[in-house]
């Protein structure tokens, strides 16, 4: 009895170690019992205690094999592992499958396997590989699978020697994935078809690229494999990802973000972009003779998927009298009208391998406006086939990314240099005289009661103005005016880009900048508001000034006699109080008194009534029957276009609006300008 118990101990120990052994016979058990009894001292050190902290610990494997994973046993990094070798399963030993994370549910299984090279996409289902965009030439590659492996066969396809045997430069990538070969597209399609068909079954075709091309740009071919991390110089080990698929996706997004801001003068190799290749080009289209996809009209500068091809420098090489971009070099037009929309080159997708090049549709991509009305199919067909508009010029490109470039050879824009602001300002602005002019205008137009309300509002902030300006000398005042003009210089671009009626005023209420939409809404011309033309407005919105209800002003905005003699010929802008009715002016100055030295980022949003610009002739026209019928037509048909906006409030001379305004301060914390946005209440 004692012998059987002692003899069973080695068998249990062997089973605990995970090694399958044959059951010993009776003689072996007796022999083991003798050795166990006589040599207990020798076997004692060999029995390892699971709780002994000093025992050697087995190194944890990165990923267990399939058999060890199912048995929940410790595996090793080597393949086949020791346990599978002992069990005779070394031929079927391969990495186990882990449960995918939710964000990797659409990732291919091969992408999640560690230790795989650049070709880790499972392309077993891909038997045909197109070698040209029009699909005329294809190479059928048969995949051979390992019969011994039943889990994840590694497909093998024909690989192509893309580069020469000469050593590559540091800009070239070390390996080329066999998924998408690179070909020299300088050869004709017929030559490519013959060479490929004759050498597919004999030996892999070898196409060479010049050494200059390799040193300039390693991505000189029409196709590339995004599955190769070396193509983009990705250091996957430093990205702190547990799988290569997530690291490659993160690196691709970073690569695209890096190249998104490339300007036409940036080098593709400096930003890691694939946008411009060195010398490899597409051949001329054999059907039409037009430049192929990737060839520019002037210098034949090719492009690839990285940068926008329309942003290359080739428009600079055109004739000086040509004011539009040539689109025929991008999309061949002659005899291939369907190429403009359905077969246009697709955008580059980043999800998987080269098969994703055809995933985005050309109809969903930003299209090119050819400069004709596409509602007429006949005209569209003629324009697309010829590539010319009715006047014989090339169609204009309206892509938003070309906005900054189209201005260079279209209608030349006025060059604006902020240095002119500092050179032109030589004298400080006469704010004191302007406030005196404002006070005189308020006394002439408003009733004594409303004049008192405005005076109280201005008197509440007068001490703050005195305190902030008493330490300023002449140089400070000149610098203050330079700050104002420089800020106004920035707001001019904002006003032109914004479609909301906008005006900018000084702290005295004088108009300093105005948008075109405000002039359309109110009828006030920009030159009149800025004081460059005479102010012939007689509309005061039913003024409550003493005496008659009509205005007591002359043809011009009233000015101070001292200012007229001091600065003759100086432009006299219109005051903000001349644009609003009486109640709106009082409300504005009360809000301005609270906001001028209060919250620096505060704003006021309320309603007001803008006064239309009306001369005496306009006032007489408003009383005629023709204008009455025009107003009835507007009420029935609504407002349409610029003419309809201009007719708002034409009868009573007031346009009810909701407006928002804020106060901007200068470096001395003094209110510098007022920015106001208006929207009519229709």
From Swiss-Prot:
Residues 134-150, 352-366 have a biased composition (Low complexity). It is found in: Nucleus. Keywords: Activator, DNA-binding, Gluconeogenesis, Metal-binding, Nucleus, Transcription, Transcription regulation, Zinc. GO terms for molecular function: DNA-binding transcription factor activity; DNA-binding transcription factor activity, RNA polymerase II-specific; RNA polymerase II transcription regulatory region sequence-specific DNA binding; zinc ion binding. SUPFAM superfamilies: Zn2/Cys6 DNA-binding domain (SSF57701). Transmembrane segments: none annotated. Residues 65-93 bind DNA. Residues 151-218, 264-287, 314-325, 376-408, 537-565 have a biased composition (Polar residues). GO terms for biological process: cellular response to starvation; gluconeogenesis. Pfam families: PAS_13 (PF24990). GO terms for cellular component: nucleus. Residues 1-58, 131-224, 261-328, 351-418, 537-569 are annotated as: Disordered. Transcription factor which regulates nonfermentable carbon utilization. Activator of gluconeogenetic genes. PANTHER family: TRANSCRIPTION ACTIVATOR OF GLUCONEOGENESIS ERT1, ZN(II)2CYS6 TRANSCRIPTION FACTOR (EUROFUNG)-RELATED. Belongs to the ERT1/acuK family. This is Transcription activator of gluconeogenesis acuK. It comes from Aspergillus fumigatus (strain ATCC MYA-4609 / CBS 101355 / FGSC A1100 / Af293) (Neosartorya fumigata).
